[in-house]
Regions:
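A basic, Ser/Thr-enriched alpha-helical scaffold prevalent
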Residues: 2-667
Length: 667
């Protein structure tokens, strides 16, 4: 035992034990001083408001952007990641529908959700108050509803307060009127419904250039109830009417403020500048109206801001011609820069709309804009900021056809957090459509496919028009090695019902016969897969009593040609029987190349009956090459009297004689 103890004493302690020992002795020595000093006060930081995706964005920033991975809102599973634009929207909105269902269950069964375990309580977990005509309400209820942007309940509570003769302060009336004017008496979409905003915004923007203001509603009633009207009351109503294009009333209120000497704020003047094109018809009168409003602002001692600049440029975009709008725009930009107002992305969007018109002369202003804003981070300052990137990429493709400029725009989009300004799903789809199209038409195919593989399918799913451009580029470059990949993507993206794409990919495979045996087999598989999918599509259409164009002769002929090149006689025979038996249902005739390929394969497989049947089809449909095909069958196969008789009957005795070339070679 003594020897064991001695051996333990000779062992060197582990470094971790030495560190622990030092810490222990240090803590003992400092315990006396710590006891004498005052205890440290713990300060709890204030709560930070976070959106549902803030933590995810913080984690994502640590690893960078990965275009090969699906968006985090989709399940990371090959069978659950959407592979089409429709599926992307369906999956995302289904998830959103689950959130809405949870909110509905909580609201409909509010009695079951009265427990408050969180401290402090989380308002989002608590069912909202339900109001009706019999509710006992107070002014504080209206204040909460206005603060929570619950428009319909706020209207109901305001009317109940008025009905019960409960006085509402002028300040609260002002807040109520601002809420109604901003949302036009309609309920706003909750902030947590991110996906619905993402997929909905592009649709709602299309119908905004028309009057949607609700006349004689509560906002106007509150305005007329206020006896001592102040400038903020006029400002709220004018801005609401201008936003929803009730331009006549908005301008009449503005004239009333001028007559009464009421001073307005800059935002109200900006809203009036935005509707100048609705107030005046001629271009010169519109510009004069803009100058008049700006002069009034100056006389009232107001300084313009970025909203003023964008409102003026927006009006200039409605002025026709080429010289006057450009002159006005450059003067405006110069004057505002003298005032120290830097343009936002919306300003540059309006400049592109003014200079790069569809039928106007070519302008290279986008080069100057990019020199000005390259490698800068932007934040939203105007709703139209989200239009810049999609418009700039459209200019690169359709106006300038410049791939280098397109890459500069794309680099700016991905600089820091600029991607937040892409807008919505509709603008994002258009942006990448233009980007891929300009690269497809200007870059080498190999370089383009690198970008294609980077973006497709997780970031962008090509539309049929983009897929058509890619197929044409493959045809021009004879790069048939990419066809299997493109066909697999067409299946994923549900493009297999597009007849123009099917005809194009078949034409490429027919006119560019591959030398690689493996590629020949892949082409055969593609052609046969195409045939089976079309057959299912036509059958499904007939079951639903829908009109279908059916198969075309040219399409079936191309599929037959490819199957014959792949030496797949069984499939080729099925295709020929389809062509031969359903002649009345097939539109047009196949090419003679397909018939020749099938006859040659039948000769190779020693099937004289099918070769003669194909000859009969050619003769009955008036192919000029029928005699030549009959001679090919007669000279290449050992035929019995029955087959020879059929050849004679179908194409005549000339097919049984040697051709002139053969006679000359015999001599």
């Amino acid at each position: 035992m003594n020897h064991l103890c001695k051996s333990f004493s000779k062992l060197h302690p582990h470094p971790a034990f030495r560190i622990a020992s030092k810490l222990l002795h240090g803590s003992r020595n400092s315990s006396t001083t710590a006891a004498s000093s005052a205890p440290e006060k713990i300060v709890i930081p204030r709560r930070i408001e976070r959106s549902p995706t803030d933590i995810l964005n913080a984690l994502s920033s640590t690893v960078g952007f990965d275009p090969t991975a699906a968006h985090y809102k989709y399940h990371d599973d090959p069978y659950l990641v959407p592979t089409s634009n429709v599926a992307k929207k369906t999956y995302a909105m289904a998830q959103e529908a689950g959130r809405k269902a949870a909110h509905w269950i909580r609201q409909e069964n509010a009695k079951l959700f009265q427990h408050k375990e969180a401290a402090p309580s989380v308002p989002a977990f608590i069912p909202t108050m339900v109001y009706n005509e019999k509710s006992q309400v107070e002014v504080t209820d209206l204040e909460k509803l206005i603060g929570n942007v619950e428009v319909k309940d706020a209207v109901l509570v305001y009317n109940l307060l008025k009905k019960n003769n409960i006085e509402v302060s002028v300040e609260l009336k002002q807040s109520m009127m601002e809420l109604l004017c901003f949302f036009n008496h309609e309920e706003s979409l909750a902030e947590e419904y991110i996906e619905e905003r993402w997929f909905r915004q592009g649709v709602t923007e299309k119908g905004r250039q028309r009057k949607t203001w609700k006349d004689f509603e509560l906002a106007e009633q509150i305005f007329h109830e206020i006896e001592d009207k102040k400038p903020e009351h006029y400002c709220a109503l004018i801005r609401g009417m201008a936003k929803y294009f009730q331009v006549e009333k908005a301008w009449a209120l503005y004239q009333e403020t001028i007559e009464k000497g009421i001073l307005l704020d800059t935002a109200t003047f900006n809203s009036l500048l935005q509707i100048a094109s609705f107030l005046k018809e001629s271009y010169e009168m519109r510009w004069n109206l803009v100058c008049e409003v700006l002069t009034t602002m100056k006389n009232q001692g107001l300084l313009p801001n970025i909203g003023t600049l964008n409102a003026v440029l927006q009006t200039i975009t409605t002025i026709g011609g080429y010289n006057h709008p450009r002159t006005y725009a450059l003067k405006t930009l110069s004057e505002f820069k003298k005032l120290g107002i830097e343009p936002s992305l919306a300003s540059w969007y309006y400049m592109l709309a003014i200079f790069c018109r569809e039928r106007g002369p070519t302008s290279h202003i986008l080069h100057d804009i990019m020199n000005e804003i390259e490698n800068k981070e932007f934040h939203i300052q105007d709703p139209k900021d989200t239009f810049f990137f999609v418009t700039a990429m459209d200019v690169c493709r359709n106006h300038l056809h410049d791939k280098d400029l397109a890459k500069r725009v794309n680099k700016l989009l991905h600089f820091k957090d600029n991607y937040n300004l892409i807008g919505d799903s509709y603008k994002e789809s258009i942006y990448y459509r233009q980007f891929l199209s300009v690269l497809c038409n200007t870059e080498p195919l190999e370089t383009f496919m690198e970008t294609y593989n980077l973006l497709v399918p997780n970031v962008y799913i090509p539309e049929p028009s983009v897929m058509e451009d890619i197929l044409k580029c493959i045809d021009v470059n004879c790069a048939v090695d990419y066809l299997p990949q493109i066909w697999s993507h067409m299946i994923q993206f549900d493009h297999t019902g597009r007849e123009n794409l099917l005809n194009l990919i078949l034409q490429i495979m027919v006119t560019n016969p591959p030398q690689n045996p493996e590629l020949v087999d892949k082409f055969t598989a593609i052609a046969w897969d195409m045939y089976k999918r079309l057959e299912e599509l036509i059958a499904a259409g007939s079951n639903r009593n829908q009109r279908s164009t059916g198969f075309s002769g040219a399409l079936l002929g191309d599929i037959l040609t490819i199957c014959c090149r792949g030496k797949d006689y069984e499939k080729a025979q099925m295709l020929f029987e389809k062509i031969n038996n359903d002649q009345n249902a097939i539109v047009g005739d196949p090419k003679v190349m397909a018939m020749r390929a099938f006859i040659e394969l039948s000769i190779e497989e020693k099937k004289p009956s099918l070769a003669v049947s194909c000859l009969q089809y050619c003769a009955e449909n008036g192919f000029p090459e029928s005699v030549e095909l009959g001679r090919l069958i007669h000279t290449s196969m050992t035929l019995d009297e029955v087959h020879i008789g059929k050849i004679h009957r179908y194409v005549g005795a000339d097919a049984l004689k040697p051709s002139k070339v053969e006679e000359e070679e015999g001599k």
